[in-house]
């Protein structure tokens, strides 16, 4: 061990001990995120509020998947949108709004509804929008929360629905089951013609040997 320390360092010596069954490297637990952001620039300029609502719904879905994956619920939501910062000053617009839920939630449908409401309030006609995004705020651990009987029943039913949704999408590929608010065409997205196939997350894209 001393020879290892001289030639590699004390870190190398610790690794040597670990490989020989002597625990000397502490395990640090990965903490859950307190805020979760989901956002991406559009593939083209967007001027319709309906397309902004569709985009924000998709970003909420992704954020909620991450939220439930770490066993958490969000107490609030922040939505922001903006034009390109490089256009003429009179054509620039950037704004954001937040809202807080009466009780913490991880229900995608509920958060999508609030996100669309905030998007409509933020939207100003005439601008060419380049980006919209969401942030889930004040995230809490679902296991540590206390509920009334009424709240528990609602949570139980909501959790079962979300569990089925996540289970199907995890097994058969992302977006196998989607909300109507997410739209179908989604031509506001970044162009993905050069995007690699999702071999590890979408069964339909697994190559077939003939």
Where are these regions (language model features)?
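Acidic, metal-coordinating catalytic segment for phosphate/diphosphate chemistry
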Residues: 101-210
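DNA-contacting surface of Y-family translesion DNA polymerases
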Residues: 1-126
């Amino acid at each position: 061990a001393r020879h290892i320390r001289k030639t590699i360092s004390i870190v190398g010596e610790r690794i040597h001990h670990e490989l020989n069954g002597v625990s000397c490297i502490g395990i640090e637990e990965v903490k859950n995120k307190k805020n979760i952001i989901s956002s991406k620039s559009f593939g083209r300029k967007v001027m319709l509020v309906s397309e902004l609502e569709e985009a924000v719904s998709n970003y909420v879905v992704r954020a909620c998947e991450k939220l439930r994956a770490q066993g958490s619920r969000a107490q609030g939501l922040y939505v922001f949108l903006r034009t390109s910062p490089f256009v003429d000053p009179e054509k620039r617009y950037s704004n954001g709004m937040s809202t807080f839920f009466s009780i913490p939630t991880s229900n995608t449908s509920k958060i999508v509804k609030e996100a669309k409401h905030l998007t409509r309030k933020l939207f100003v006609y005439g601008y060419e929008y380049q980006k919209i995004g969401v942030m889930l705020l004040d995230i809490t651990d679902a296991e540590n929360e206390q509920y009334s009987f009424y709240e528990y029943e609602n949570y139980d039913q909501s959790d079962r629905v979300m569990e089925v949704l996540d289970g199907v999408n995890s097994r058969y590929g992302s977006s196998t089951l989607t909300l109507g608010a997410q739209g179908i065409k989604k031509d506001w997205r970044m162009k993905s013609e050069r995007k690699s196939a999702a071999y590890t997350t979408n069964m339909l894209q697994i190559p077939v040997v003939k």
